[in-house]
Design a protein with these regions (language model features):
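C-terminal helical subdomain
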Residues: 71, 188-191, 208-243, 252
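Short C-terminal tail/terminal secondary-structure segment
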Residues: 2-5, 99-102, 153, 233, ...
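Residue(s) in the substrate-gating loop at a strand-loop-helix junction
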Residues: 148
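Substrate-binding pocket helix/loop in short-chain dehydrogenase/reductase
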Residues: 103-105, 109-114, 213
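Canonical Rossmann dinucleotide-binding motif of NAD(H)/NADP(H)-dependent dehydrogenases/reductases
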Residues: 7-39
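Short, small/polar-rich loop/turn modules that mediate ligand/substrate recognition or access, typified
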Residues: 180, 185, 243-245
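Active-site helix of classical SDR
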Residues: 128, 164, 172
């Protein structure tokens, strides 16, 4: 829970993609601890249901919807369900994403390029496209998109991932300007090396692989999903009411080296 938390989100509704584990699950739980009811969306039904059950154990309502963010019909159906059950959408965390297989640009397959860009960038666009009209009807809201440290600098062997995450930052800034005057604040978070299942896959899940990844962090450790969740919840709160179109880097100093 955030410091000095007092349930400021009571009666409000949050929509979180990529909620089956990692940053998405931590953020869904953080919204619930702040008083919100939460719609959790993910392609993984088992993990998504586990997140929903944990939210209900916190005393908040939750619904789990299967959603492939590459598919406009899935995104629309998930948000239609949100309105059907809760009647409103106050916050959205567009977080679903996947890691890229390491490959230099010329060796990157078209299929891998399409997979990364369609999930990590197109998915965010589709969520925004269907979330924003619901917030317009409500008179406002707050949206946070997940970019990455790879959204603010380049990384060798990660052309598709870097391009997609830079795209999320650009999309966030453009959309923020489109809707700021309508009381819809849109921002992004740019996590560094966070201890999640995705990072385990990227590092190979071995102690040696993890240590190699940690060696890139000036702070000397991986970040925790809750550290990103706290930032997302803050960006959605009234404390951040003047923060618009910002890409918040949360990376232990990795990108300032």
């Amino acid at each position: 829970m955030l410091p000095n938390s007092n349930g400021n989100f009571t009666g409000k509704v949050a929509f979180v993609t990529g909620a089956a584990n990692g940053i998405g699950r931590a953020t869904a739980l953080a919204f619930a601890r702040e008083g919100a009811n939460v719609v959790v969306a993910d392609i993984s039904e088992q993990g998504n249901q586990e997140t929903a059950r944990t939210i209900e154990e916190l005393g908040r309502r939750a619904i789990a919807v299967k959603c492939d963010v590459r598919r406009a019909e899935d995104v629309k159906a998930a948000l239609d369900k949100t309105i059907e059950i809760f009647g409103r959408l106050d916050f959205a965390f567009n977080n679903a994403g996947v890691e890229q297989k390491i490959a230099t640009t010329a060796d990157l397959t078209e299929e891998e390029w399409d997979r990364i860009v369609n999930i990590n960038l197109r998915g965010v666009f589709l969520c925004l496209k269907h979330e924003i009209p619901l917030m317009q009807k409500l008179g406002g809201g707050a949206i946070v998109n997940t970019s990455s440290g790879a959204g603010v600098k380049g990384f060798k062997g990660q052309a598709a991932y870097v391009a997609a995450k830079h795209g999320v930052v650009g999309l966030t800034k453009a959309a923020a300007l489109d809707y700021a005057a309508q009381n819809i604040r849109i921002n992004a978070v740019c996590p560094g090396i966070i201890d999640t299942p995705m990072m385990d896959r990227f590092s190979g899940g071995t102690p040696e692989g993890r240590q190699q990844v940690i060696s890139q962090e000036p702070i000397g450790r991986m970040g925790q999903p809750e550290e990103i969740a706290n930032a997302v919840v803050w960006l959605c709160s009234e404390a951040a009411a003047f923060v618009v179109g910002h890409a918040m880097v949360i990376d232990g100093g990795q990108t300032v080296q």
